[in-house]
Amino acid sequence: MNVIEANGLGKRYGSTWALRDCTLAIPDGHVVALVGPNGAGKTTLLNLAVGLTAPSTGTVTVLGDTRPGSRTALDGIAFVAQDTPLYKNLSIADMLHLTRNLNRYFDQGYAEARLGELGIPSTRKAGKLSGGQQAQLALTLALARRPRLLVLDEPMSSLDPLARHDFMATVMTAIADDGVSVVLSSHVLAELERVADYFVLLSSGSVQVAGEVDDLLACHRVLTGPASEADRCADRLRVVHTRRGEAQAHLLIRTNGSADPVPQGWEAHPVTLEELTLAYLREPGASSLPGPVRARHTEPMDVAK
């Protein structure tokens, strides 16, 4: 089963398309990294999935329900937004009471126990908590709904490294204990590489890359060799992106999983998720979806890298 399916999905604001012709299937039981530059459509896609806005074109199905935002669909979803929406003037106890009354599957015992472990007193107002504590409170309220799908829209953007680590530790515990599927939008590639096993890259409102992380890494490599031979080598390969220096060039290539021979005088290296992401971000015309790589670009190499 897929937790999210989009078919020709689009959202237009006036004459501007925030998301266009988005077709995507996100399988159950995964931690999904949703990546893209600012304005790529990440938040729009997530808002469509949780029913906060309606599509202009196409359809989106969430947990088998074709009506995002309906009571049955929302029963299985928990959403934590970037701005950590909380009632800042309410105490923690009042927040728990309110959330319990609004959600029929809310696990009060879990929420109280989790906040106790975090050392967050029930008498304190939400607005008096630190940024990390507010993020943990929002996450606790979301997980206490016992969702099948947890949607996180850059919830760690304002957190320090320790708070981000603690936040993700809570998420990973929920995955291990309850089998929650997670869709996580973030710009912090290093964190995503540690936790994600499925990857989606949006560019200009459309899906550019999608697939299992292991499969994507297996069918991409970095070739390093003489800069003078880069063009000749690239003509025989599916090159996504080239970085060229005075002496050496680095070609990120797609192999489609085949054991393509390494050209003479070149060395092959495994690719990291960060390298793959940056290469495709620099090549809006290239795609790892079915079909050929559609663009190749040469960029001067930063010798400090």
Each language-model region and where it sits:
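The feature captures the beta-strand-to-loop junction immediately N-terminal to the Walker
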Residues: 35-37
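Helix-to-loop junction immediately C-terminal to a conserved catalytic motif
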Residues: 50
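ABC transporter nucleotide-binding domain
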Residues: 166-254
